[in-house]
Amino acid sequence: MLSSFSALACACTDEHYGESHLAELVIEQGRIVLDLGESRYRMLNTIGNGVKIEITRQEKPLLITRVSETRVAAFSSQCTHAGYEVLLPEQGILACASGHGGTFDLEGRVLSEPPKSNLQSYPAQLITNRIYVAYPFG
């Protein structure tokens, strides 16, 4: 059963890709579904890239990254140090926008402090050309 949710998918930013895409998310069986054939998610076909998904009533977007040929990760883009937003990956590194020097790997694990804990993660699965993310809507 397909349904749509009142959320916006911002799959890229002007800074990194030159355009921004906003659209309703597709939800199947309570999971966010991203089709890698769609232009707004196509950058996730490349290891090291990421997209942000704006979720209605959430302060910071959901961040999804391509970790390897067979793995993806999904997590909150809210830095665990001071609550600033974590930026899209550059050269496989996620940096906190605060300028405090905190960085994370493509799976949301702390690489450099001041953050002491990993980003809040959500189960994500790559099946063929689709990514499924179990996100706790509510």
Regions found by a protein language model. Give the residues of each.
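N-terminal export leaders
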Residues: 1-7
